[in-house]
């Protein structure tokens, strides 16, 4: 009941001071816009969003490093390591290898259409559970025999055939090679770069997929490991470290030492890795977020605090009268905080809506601002954000917490200082 009274009084005060209220709401909204844009960008990068819904159980190996007394070589993982080590990990539910992506030319009856293709294996669709609208994944037998059976996204099937229905079994030319459609999946977004493609096909369709390089461990694959629910990250890492130890004491290395530089690592860890052969500098990452938090929270809080202090000076006579009639300092403080919480809440809603509009209109450009080495999306790829990215419960929780913190920091100190004035001094402010 008291909260209802406080909010009613806050609404009346807001109508009595439209200029102050407008400036306060807009100031809060601007701060929330910047905060929510960053929050949503990192949510899309780190949280389990379609089709990368297994991110919390996914470990990544992007590269390996081979070192001897004279030099160091780094590259992606070799086919031999993928086949002999990662496919048979006991702590993994399943592992998948990706032999890169490429831009290919697809020919239908009318024209050539560029495509973004991903070369992988049948396990890919278990690590990244794309929703099949029609058909099924290509099989292990397809991969082993190099059969050109492919999976299309629904958006690309629409572009290629003019429909998403009944395309399984159809053939088309991809880089002048005949391929057959065995499945159609719900399209993801280029904003999830580890899983996105328009066409998925076995890596054995690509020339040189099993080539042996100058070093046994180095090649062209990235590995994604879906660990068993009963296992931990440490279990997977220990199993891989034991394989590395055995390799380094054997004759296979021929004087070279293998190092995976802290990998396998959790998916969200891997997103902060700048260089494939250098471990993540967590000190730099932490200070980066501390700096962002300080700028986005405390700078607007100090500005709003100044506005509230000025208003508190004008309200001293009113506060003095309330105290004279028995209102406690605590009750008045709670009331002032609720008054400002209403304004902060309205600013938060305004900022959240503007943040959604900014992200919807800017597309990939706003996401590329947070990449050290941004990728340039090829023509025709899906850059859209799914509903699970826009309206995630965690985003609303973050907005609410930021709103509460901003309100407390900006309102608490000026309100407390104003309420410390003696009753007589507060009443004299009216003269």
Mark where each language-model region is.
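C-terminal membrane-exit region of the final transmembrane helix in multipass inner-membrane proteins
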Residues: 6, 389-431
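Transmembrane alpha-helical interface segments in multi-pass membrane proteins
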Residues: 19-23, 27-31, 317-363, 398, ...
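Structured, solvent-exposed hinge/loop segments at the ends of secondary-structure elements
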Residues: 39-166, 173-179, 368-381
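Membrane-interfacial segments
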Residues: 42-53, 317, 358, 362-374, ...
């Amino acid at each position: 009941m008291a909260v209802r009274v406080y909010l009613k009084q806050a609404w009346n005060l807001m109508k009595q001071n439209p200029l102050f209220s407008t400036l306060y709401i807009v100031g809060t909204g601007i701060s929330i816009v910047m905060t929510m844009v960053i929050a949503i960008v990192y949510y899309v990068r780190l949280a389990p969003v379609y089709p990368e819904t297994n991110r919390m159980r996914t470990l990544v190996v992007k590269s390996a490093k081979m070192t001897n007394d004279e030099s160091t070589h780094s590259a992606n993982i070799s086919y031999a390591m993928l086949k002999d080590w990662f496919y048979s990990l006991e702590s993994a539910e399943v592992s998948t290898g990706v032999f890169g992506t490429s831009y290919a030319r697809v020919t239908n009856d009318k024209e050539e259409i560029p495509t973004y293709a991903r070369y992988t294996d049948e396990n890919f669709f278990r690590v990244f559970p794309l929703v099949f609208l029609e058909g099924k994944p290509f099989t292990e037998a397809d991969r082993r025999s190099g059969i050109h059976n492919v999976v299309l996204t629904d958006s690309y099937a629409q572009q290629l055939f003019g429909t998403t229905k009944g395309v399984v079994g159809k053939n088309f030319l991809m880089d002048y090679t005949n391929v057959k459609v065995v499945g159609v999946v719900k399209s993801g977004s280029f904003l999830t770069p580890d899983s996105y493609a328009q066409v998925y096909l076995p890596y054995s369709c690509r020339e040189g997929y099993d080539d042996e390089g100058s070093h046994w461990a180095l090649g062209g694959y990235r590995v994604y490991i879906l660990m068993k629910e009963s296992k931990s990250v440490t279990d997977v890492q220990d199993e891989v470290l034991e394989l590395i130890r055995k390799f380094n004491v054997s004759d296979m290395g021929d004087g070279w030492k293998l190092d995976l530089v802290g990998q396998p690592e959790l998916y969200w860890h891997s997103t902060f890795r700048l260089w494939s052969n250098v471990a993540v500098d967590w000190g730099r990452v932490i200070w980066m977020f501390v700096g962002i938090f300080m700028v986005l929270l405390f700078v607007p809080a100090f500005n709003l605090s100044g506005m509230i202090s000025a208003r508190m000076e004008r309200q001293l006579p009113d506060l003095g009268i309330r105290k004279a009639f028995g209102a406690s300092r605590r009750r008045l403080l709670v009331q002032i905080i609720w008054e400002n919480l209403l304004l902060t809440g309205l600013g938060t809603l305004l900022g959240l809506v503007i943040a959604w509009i900014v992200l919807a209109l800017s597309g990939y450009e706003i996401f590329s601002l947070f990449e050290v080495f941004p990728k340039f999306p090829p023509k025709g790829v899906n850059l859209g954000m799914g509903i699970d990215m826009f309206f995630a419960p965690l985003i609303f929780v973050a907005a609410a917490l930021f709103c509460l913190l901003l309100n407390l920091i900006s309102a608490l100190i000026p309100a407390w200082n104003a309420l410390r004035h003696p009753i007589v001094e507060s009443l004299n402010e009216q003269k």
